[in-house]
Design a protein with these regions (language model features):
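Extracellular "leader-to-stem" segments immediately downstream of a signal peptide or signal-anchor
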Residues: 4-11, 16-85, 90-103, 107-214, ...
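Short, small-residue-enriched loops and turns at beta-alpha junctions
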Residues: 58-60, 289-293, 323-324, 350
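Short, T/G/N/S-enriched strand-turn elements that build extracellular solenoid repeat scaffolds
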Residues: 73-77, 92-101, 222, 231-237, ...
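Short glycine/acidic-rich loop motifs that flank beta-strands on beta-rich extracellular proteins
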Residues: 81, 95, 115-117, 150-154, ...
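Conserved short loop/turn motifs at secondary-structure junctions
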Residues: 86-93, 259-261, 347-348
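Active-site-proximal loop/turn and secondary-structure-junction residues that shape catalytic pockets
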Residues: 90, 237, 247, 286-288, ...
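Right-handed parallel beta-helix
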Residues: 108-109, 137-145, 216-226, 239-251, ...
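Extracellular beta-rich repeat passengers
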Residues: 321, 332, 341-463
Length: 463
């Protein structure tokens, strides 16, 4: 194995990035919280360092470097773990599978670009996420570079959400139009083969950008994550996760372009991030229905000092959360240009119960719909379908023990909206808030009025 002699400055930056995460500097975010939680344990990465270029990788945007990434991961693994440095350049690759005690470090002007050829994401007939890890510990993705999922080669497009020029650009790629020209699918493209027999089957094979499953001690810091085929960053059943200073972005109309989705995780810090995406911004999920009961709830999550621009919701719980969501603090965040600000959505068959959710010091502007919305009959509408209301009689959503204070929302169409019964929406307190509404101050359905039994308002200005 050849190990390139990295510059002292590069090595110092890498070590500083991971050392600051292990030195307990996140403790200041946990002072005087409304609920008890401790800062997550950061990953422990050995000091070994290699460059991806040492393994034959070429950053020319043309050479496919999948095997070079795999070889670098194997090599650093034999050393007990360490840092894999991605220098400046465009590094085209297929899926990257991380192992224990590895830091993937992107230097400034480094761009990891995932292959637009869907066949490069296939293994044993199944598609792989762009970056993944399963049942691993001490994983980090750090630096100042960009990770790009090439999502436009995967996502369906709705004609009503793009300009004439953009629509013609998609048509020039080839593809398949459906629903009377209202939809375009990247099936039958001019330059790349399909991986499914029809466009509907291929649509279901879209991959996530970064999917970490059953992992412990995870750090994602500083990088830009953009243009995912589906969700961007989705830790699932992970413990001790830190997401710090990350930019997550994709076109506003990207189908299912969720930003940060926390699914059945515990002890998570989400801090100093910027999100600008096509679906939910920062979202808590906990599985839907009976299958979710074998998993732990989302628990002990701190979300603070983040900015969300376009998203369907700035902070979201749902739609599936049957395992429960508890002990969450959402503090000092800004939402500018989101469809909704605080969004609580679910439906029978996928609901669960919330507990000890504290939200305060939230600043919103230019909110397209509601500043705060509770919805218990949410209908998921996959692209190309009409959607269908749930007929389930079990796993009813119960949004309760939610406390919202010190929210200022300017230019929101509706201040507070709730759709559901007092059995599903109760124990909600909203205090010391001001909502400047452009259409109506409130919209209630099923709940007759604000009050002790459902949503209690105290010192709230609705203008």
């Amino acid at each position: 194995m050849i190990i390139r002699q990295l510059s002292a400055i590069t090595l110092a930056i890498i070590l500083l990035t991971t050392a600051t995460a292990t030195a307990g500097d996140y403790g200041r975010y946990y002072d005087k919280l409304p609920i008890k939680m401790a800062e997550p344990d950061a990953p422990q990465i050995p000091d070994n360092t290699v460059s991806i270029a040492d393994f034959g990788a070429v950053g020319d945007g043309i050479t496919l470097n999948t095997e070079a990434f795999a070889e670098a991961i194997r090599a650093i693994g034999k050393l007990g773990g360490g840092h894999i440095v991605i220098p400046a350049g465009i590094w085209l690759t297929g899926p990257i599978v991380l192992k224990d005690r590895i830091d993937l470090h992107l230097e400034r002007n480094a761009l990891i670009l995932f292959s637009p050829d869907k066949k490069d994401h296939l293994k044993d007939g199944k598609v792989q996420s762009c970056i993944s890890a399963s049942k691993r510990s001490d994983i980090s993705i750090t630096g100042e570079g960009i990770i790009d999922g090439n999502g436009e080669w995967w996502r369906a497009v709705k004609r009503g959400k793009v300009s004439d020029t953009e629509w013609k650009d998609f048509q020039r790629m080839g593809g398949t139009e459906a629903d009377g020209g209202k939809l375009w699918y990247p099936f039958g493209l001019k330059n790349y083969d399909d991986i499914a027999p029809d466009f509907k089957a291929q649509e279901k094979m879209r991959v996530h950008m970064i999917r970490l499953t059953d992992c412990e001690r995870v750090l994602v810091k500083g990088v830009t994550i953009q243009n995912s085929p589906k969700f961007h960053l989705i830790p699932t059943r992970c413990k001790h996760v830190i997401i710090d200073g990350v930019t997550v972005r994709c076109p506003w109309n990207a189908q299912n372009g969720d930003g940060i989705d926390i699914s059945c995780c515990q002890d998570v810090l989400i801090v100093n991030n910027t999100v600008d995406v096509g679906d939910d911004g920062i979202c808590m999920k906990a599985g839907g229905g009976a299958a979710a009961l074998k998993y732990p709830p989302v628990a002990r999550i701190l979300i603070r000092d983040n900015t969300v621009f376009h998203a369907h919701g700035g902070f979201v719980i749902g739609s599936e959360f049957s395992a429960g969501v508890e002990d969450v603090a959402v503090l000092s965040n800004t939402f500018s240009g989101t469809d909704t600000g605080l969004r609580f959505k679910s439906a029978p068959g996928r609901g669960g119960k919330t507990a000890r959710i504290y939200i305060s010091d939230i600043y919103m502007s230019d909110i397209r719909d509601q500043a705060i919305v509770f919805e218990t009959s949410y209908v998921d509408v996959p692209v190309g379908t009409a959607g269908k209301a749930s007929e389930a009689q079990d796993f009813l959503p119960e949004f309760t023990d939610i406390h919202i204070s010190n929210v200022v929302a300017r230019d929101t169409r509706i201040g507070i909206a709730a759709k559901g019964t007092t059995q599903m929406i109760h124990g909600i307190s909203i205090s010391d808030c001001a909502f400047f509404c452009t259409e109506k101050i409130a919209e209630l359905s099923g709940i007759e009025a604000f009050g002790e039994g459902s949503i209690k308002l105290e010192n709230v200005k609705l203008l």
